[in-house]
């Protein structure tokens, strides 16, 4: 089974994450940040990953540490669940519409973490959530999952729709990239023989 559990404790947060890459989209999310919970529930549902995330964070300061550390731990869990990456599709991309918004997400499960993030918001907050934290989450996730991740919003107006588009796009493209390709016949999808 391609599952993993991660616990991460710092002076700022206490995070526990579990993931099943071959799940059905079940989510149990409790970060203390309502909008982040919503985005992570979308991630689980659209990726068809079973995900449990619990964060106790220093929300009396702000939502930054909670959001970033959730991304770190989720990325670590994905990397652990993938193991040696034998048989995976490795690459995937998607154009993800959300009403007036269209975002493009591309992934390479390369073992070379990198983020290109070309998404911007016209407002600083979605409810109480700082929109700059969307990038912080994606950065933390990509670096710790060991993936190359390109995120670009081609156009969009509504900040909620933009955020939802990139989170759903991450989920849908990751779902395709981690899928087992029977033609790989259990091989690592690289001429180097490892990722």
UniProtKB/Swiss-Prot annotation:
InterPro entries: IGPD_sf, ImidazoleglycerolP_deHydtase, ImidazoleglycerP_deHydtase_CS, Ribosomal_Su5_D2-typ_SF. GO terms for cellular component: cytoplasm. One of its GO terms (biological process) is L-histidine biosynthetic process. It is an enzyme of class 4 (lyase). Pathway: Amino-acid biosynthesis; L-histidine biosynthesis; L-histidine from 5-phospho-alpha-D-ribose 1-diphosphate: step 6/9. It comes from the Bacteria. PROSITE patterns: IGP_DEHYDRATASE_1, IGP_DEHYDRATASE_2. Keywords: Amino-acid biosynthesis, Cytoplasm, Histidine biosynthesis, Lyase. Its EC number is 4.2.1.19. It is found in: Cytoplasm. Its main location: cytoplasm. GO terms for molecular function: imidazoleglycerol-phosphate dehydratase activity. Pfam families: IGPD. It catalyses: D-erythro-1-(imidazol-4-yl)glycerol 3-phosphate = 3-(imidazol-4-yl)-2-oxopropyl phosphate + H2O. Belongs to the imidazoleglycerol-phosphate dehydratase family. This is Imidazoleglycerol-phosphate dehydratase.
